[in-house]
Amino acid sequence: MTGVQTCALPISIVSLTNHSYFNLAGYNAGPVDDLVLQLDCDKINSLDNELIPDGKLIDVEGTPYDFRKAKKVGEGFGADFPMMKEFGGYDNNFVFADQSGKYFKRGSLEDTKSGRKLDLYTDQPCVQVYTGNMINVNDPAFKNGVKQYTHCAVCLETQAMPDSINHPGFTNTVLKPGEKYDTTTTFAFFN
């Protein structure tokens, strides 16, 4: 479980996240293509030419970003979709359908071969999904000299809406003096 609390002194913009990598198939078990992902997200952020959110949201229906029903992560890797082609995998902010700020289960990641499963609980409005698209064998090695490789793990980074300060209607990330920032994300593991 990750719980974060902080208080602002001057007015601050706050949207903290984690950057944990998961491959439930196991260490050095190959790419995450066959892991099964489910997210209660109905939209993703649209991005400008500099890959910054442009204030618009894209409905996931009929796109490789629709994980409302569980499916293999790798199913979308070769999709004919502009952002998928540019990133070579997922590196997108997914917006949860329920924006109440309540803490509950928002998704899961599963390796059906081993039976390992991760359930994602959070009170955050979004999750950035990153599938290690930019990782390559020239990066520093993992433990025991094992080489890194593209799609070797997936990140589920709960967060506020990125660049929200510049887009009315996005998550409020302004923290004023005396206000408290308090958020909780839990990764529950099962086997």
What are these regions (language model features)?
Residues M1-L9:
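Short, small-residue-biased leader/transition segments that mark boundaries at the very start
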Residues A8-N191:
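An exposed, glycine/acidic-rich loop-and-rim segment of catalytic or binding clefts
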